[in-house]
Amino acid sequence: MNLSEYDWPCPTGITPFAHQKETAAFLAAKPKAFCFNEQGTGKTASVIWATDYLMKLKLLKRVLVICPLSIMSSAWQQDLFKFAVHRRVAVAYGSANKRKEIISGDAEYVIINFDGVQICKAEIIAGGFDLIVVDEASAYKNAQTERWKTLRDVMRHVKGLWMLTGTPAAQSPTDAYGLAKLINPQAVPTFFGQFKDMVMYPVTKFKWVPRPNAQVVVSRVLQPAIRFEKRQCIDLPDITYLYREAPMTSQQLKYYKKLKEDMLIEAAGEEVSAVNAAVKLNKLLQIACGSVYTDTKEVVDFDAGNRLQALKEVIDEASHKVLVFVPFTHTIKQISDHLTKCGISSEIINGSVPVNARTDIVKRFQEQQDPRVLIIQPQAASHGLTLTAADTVVWYAPVPSVETYLQANARIDRPGQKNTMTVVHIMGSAVEAKLYTLLRNNVYSHEELVKLYKQELSETT
């Protein structure tokens, strides 16, 4: 579709990249389509421009965006405010009644998370949506799940569906089946077993491996589709910075609030030093991450399911290897255990790993398929190491040093890096968002730390 007369609304100083314009034009011409552009290429903006263009032509009235909880506000809502400020936008999150009320309202764009679709199925069907956009669409790869069946039922009442993921069928060629059944059902057999036979064959009673032509079949059934890899987008900046929200669980919030109340009592009438502010803020960050050290050096674990899920989503969407920087020792173990449960290979580099073992881990990370993820304590490996097999850095929590932050990011930004890089910041509290801003702006000073600590105590959780 020709968007030559479209005005491409943008904030001052921002212009669409060529690949974003091409992606928007492709999607605008297709009622149902895939967008497989890699993480960090600006898929969200392309979708917003395409839908806004169709709305201006009166071909579209309402859009439902289905995405992970971690990017409802930090990606979709913020980008809609940037690139479609003239449109009505609402986030359907909270109680079931609140979500249903928002869906039944007059917002032109409604953003909801995966689980919310099942809760609000009837309201979505009756909501007058012309198009559904599914971000991180791999969540719908399994056609046997209730999540998939709910979307299938909804799509019987909605004309358009765009599915976005940077890593289609990354784990197995059979992952393409659920996606294809939603966009292009005629391309795949009626039954999953038939498709599995097309793309895999058994080598033992319990082990199946991909057929030599599996990727060709996957590419054929996942159509119509557009894909840009970061290395193809020559106008992209070398490093793209992204943010993911991971709301604290009810257990975390309870103890976070209690700790703030205790700090408020302690701070009454006292002069706050930078050292004291750093220690106290560190405790709050520990709770947000899922493990806190008591004054007696014991470790108390919290339910950090939202944060772990946000991390897994980033890893799943990454096309190459990933570095995860984690300031707290015990949280590193939590993450390692979680990735193991998810079938994601990882290794740990922290202060307790001997030099010889560290050298071996780095060599395998750079040269072999596994490990896919390195979980790193920033203070232990922010200098010197070359880790260019990764093109994505994840900050599980902010660190108290601009130098450490910059040096850690530089582990992937070294000679030998062949891809455009992405740095993702995970946050679950306002103080983390402010700390990341200080790090990005290179202004992490003692004065700013004390100021931030006082601000945090003055705000109710």
Question: Positions of the model-derived regions?
Answer:
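Short basic/glycine-enriched coil/helix segment immediately N-terminal to the Walker B
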Residues: 27-31, 104-107, 120-130, 154-156
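Conserved Helicase C-terminal RecA-like lobe
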Residues: 1-4, 14, 28-29, 40-42, ...
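Conserved pre-motif I regulatory segment
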Residues: 2-36
